[in-house]
Amino acid sequence: MTAEQLLEKTYAAFNARDVDRALSAMHPEVAWPNGMEGGCVHGHRGIREYWTRQWGLIDPRVEPRGFEWEPDGRVAVDVHQVVRDLAGRVVKDEMVRHVYRLEAGLIRSMEIRSGPSRGAGAPGPTRTGP
């Protein structure tokens, strides 16, 4: 499985609220940003607890729009993120950049950066490799 396929699988699992499927793509000691409260959560248990808490408050959906390899080997993903409140009202609609470090074919860490490098107007998915 390519890095892009692994990440697409993970985004699809997150959007389906299938925590077990998403965690199957992650290293047991994964480091994950807590985008709601700040800081970072660690490991499968930390992510499960964080996402469960998050989904009880908001309804986020993330769609990868393009992949790019960074010089240090990490994979950057331009993501369209739409966050709704539990009544369905859009509270956030933006492009963000997620940057992943992979280890042994699994996600080892992720960081969130504001805005994609190519801008939100980039046409369709873009994939570039190392």
Spans of model-derived segments:
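A beta-strand edge to alpha-helix "cap/lid" segment located at domain peripheries
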Residues: 1-2, 48-130
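Short, well-ordered alpha-helical segments enriched in acidic and aromatic residues
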Residues: 16-31
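A short gly/proline-enriched turn/hairpin at secondary-structure junctions
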Residues: 31-41, 53-57, 113
